[in-house]
Amino acid sequence: MSAFSMAPLFRQSIGFDRFNDLFESALRNEAGSTYPPYNIEKHGDERYRIVIAAAGFQESDLDVQVERGVLSVSGGKRENRSEGVTYLHQGIAQRAFKLSFRLVDHIEVKGAELRNGLLSIELVRIVPERPAPSAFRSAAAGRPLES
């Protein structure tokens, strides 16, 4: 009997510590969902960062949105062909893309920055405090009751 890791299937949710627990579920686009390449980093106990290789894109070409617990990052290069230019080899990909990441509860996007061709999206986990247990006195017995 061979062991099978589910970790690669759950690569696109952010918020837990281990890969099997780290990811709630994956959102897969088309077969080309590995473009552009990206990293998911953990910084301390409560901070995460998604770094997306966005070489050749400007801030105006990128869109970052969070809706219903899904972080969506899309990019589309505007046509900017110079007249008289013929590409002998065009190896720099400038195609449109869309990546989606399901955020688990209590993960918030704190900001995004494009620097040196890398789009960094900062995430933080904000876990609400647990309510303190309440004690009540029974009118008949005069002793505390736990709720």
Curated annotation (Swiss-Prot):
Gene: ibpB
Protein name, UniProt field: 16 kDa heat shock protein B
Disulfide bonds: none
Lineage: Bacteria, Pseudomonadati, Pseudomonadota, Gammaproteobacteria, Pseudomonadales
Domain sHSP residues, every copy: 29-141
Keywords: Stress response
Organism this protein belongs to: Azotobacter vinelandii
InterPro entries in alphabetical order: A-crystallin/Hsp20_dom, ACD_IbpA/B, HSP20-like_chaperone
Family that this chain belongs to: Belongs to the small heat shock protein (HSP20) family.
